[in-house]
Amino acid sequence: MDARADQIYNPYRVFTRAQWAKLRDDTPMTLNATEIAALRSMYDRLDLKEVEEIYLPLSRLLSIYVAATQQLYFAQRRFLGIVDRKMPYIIGVAGSVAVGKSTTARVLQALLARWSPRPKVDLITTDGFLYSNAMLERQGMMQKKGFPESYDLPRLLAFLSDIKAGRRRVRAPIYSHLTYDIVPNEYVTVDRPDILIVEGVNVLQTGRLPRDGKAVPVVSDFFDFSVYIDADEPVLREWYVQRFLALRDTAFHDPRSYFHRYAPLSDEEATATALAIWERTNLANLEDNILPTRPRATLIMKKGTDHVVETVALRRL
């Protein structure tokens, strides 16, 4: 297929970093360097330039999408002749382990919350909907933690359904990255936000089509917009190893850490351990479950080796 044909049939418009940065237009910078540093994960890179050139154009785009969705909502309400609660706008953020999803989600939350008028913007991660370690151990699934089958999908779908229905004080379980497990009897409460950001590796996952033709909901059915954070596999592998080494020198030293046993490892031993975990679990999950969902995203941000976004692909309407 020649370049022109590929452009015609490509469902995305692809922008270079420079092209995308120009779409910021006059969107104001509402974060300072200190606030940006606080949003950044310890093993990620984010600076004022990245926010200006990548996230401010995305914030502007999202403001357009949210406004259009609100107009459509009110038009539908007039058509149906009903008075209904305003439904929150839900944004999904997907991508591999170590790609920087959490940083992206936090930056979006901070920027969107400073729109005028100030909307209520909440953020949850799907980690809280993982089955407990005890359950995964009983099912022999600890090696597949993070795979689609390791999540309590009915509970996650019920949560999103309640949010979309406008219910008050909907609770989501809390996950501890220190203990690598669900925190018993602790929850975060989501109370009718204007915008909800849902971050997780498999949020764009689809299920198998039922043979009986019955509708089977998936998480992304509840999304109004979705972002996939992308990077080449060798780059992701290197970032995962770097993160593992950084955690070995910090969080792993806490006796409560699930990975405390790795704290004494040498650089060589820690690197070998991280690579083994990547190959056994994260790479398999990426290739089998995460990467195949990339074409379902509304927008794809592709990162280079230095953690900065190099290209942005926006799905055509």
Curated annotation (Swiss-Prot):
Annotated localization: Cytoplasm
Protein name, entry field: Pantothenate kinase
GO cellular component: cytoplasm
InterPro entries: P-loop_NTPase (IPR027417), PanK (IPR004566), PRK/URK (IPR006083)
Chain sites annotated for binding ATP: G95, S96, V97, A98, V99, G100, K101, S102
Keywords for the protein's UniProt record, in alphabetical order: ATP-binding, Coenzyme A biosynthesis, Cytoplasm, Kinase, Nucleotide-binding, Transferase
Membrane-spanning residues: none
Superkingdom of origin: Bacteria
EC number: 2.7.1.33
Catalytic activity line of the entry: (R)-pantothenate + ATP = (R)-4'-phosphopantothenate + ADP + H(+)
Pfam families (UniProt xref): PRK (PF00485)
UniProt record similarity statement: Belongs to the prokaryotic pantothenate kinase family.
UniProt-recorded Gene Ontology molecular function terms: ATP binding; pantothenate kinase activity
Pathway(s) annotated for this protein in UniProt: Cofactor biosynthesis; coenzyme A biosynthesis; CoA from (R)-pantothenate: step 1/5
GO terms (BP aspect): coenzyme A biosynthetic process
